[in-house]
Amino acid sequence: LFSSADFHIQTAPVCSKGSVHLTAGPISRKPRMGRLQVRENLGISEQVPMVLITMGGIPKHHGFIDQLANQNEVFFVAPGAVTGFQALGNVILLPHRSDFFHPDLVNAADAVVGKVGYSTLAEVYHAQIPYGYIKRTRFQESEILSEYIGNHMAGFAIDERIFEDGDWILRVPELLDQPSVTREDPNGAEAAADFVLKLLNGDAG
């Protein structure tokens, strides 16, 4: 199917590079709501650091929730962990399907901790915040995505066992202190749309 197309677009990170007409940057959904409004809806002050714990849309109950209280100067938001909105001190648990748009949560956070996946990577990339990323050994693309994070984004890798045990929580201050990566490149979706528009106008080939 790929080879039968007349024009080819790939988006970074690319797992299998080929001869293409355009390699665009990471493509992510844009936030719908401003950072301050999202934090207000969550009940989190702008002055308080917020860390988003995400498994990329997969419902997941975390066994380390109680340990998050040890970092009481930081608010943690974990989607997919419960059936309804819960506020437990400095921890906010959200249901798998909530009123909060995932890119909005990423944009409202100061750092993200979660599994390596394309959509989360792209959202964190454009939010320009640190990423504590969990490699998934059973997924072939995990190594390529992790390499891209290491070369283009702030943050560090977290072993799956360390994540599940909650030992990573001690490194939250280190994650928040990571220097931000400032960039002005457009969302890959815009670059791809511009390319298609030029094709329709007869300006690309």
Functional labels for PLM-detected ranges:
Residues P13, G56, G117:
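Short glycine-/small-residue-rich Rossmann-like dinucleotide-binding loops
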Residues R29-A111:
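Donor-nucleotide binding loops and adjacent catalytic segments primarily
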Residues L93-H96, H126, P130-E174:
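Nucleotide-sugar donor-binding patch of glycosyltransferase catalytic domains
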Residues F101-I144:
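A donor-sugar binding/catalytic signature common to diverse glycosyltransferases
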Residues D167-G205:
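C-terminal amphipathic helix plus adjacent low-complexity
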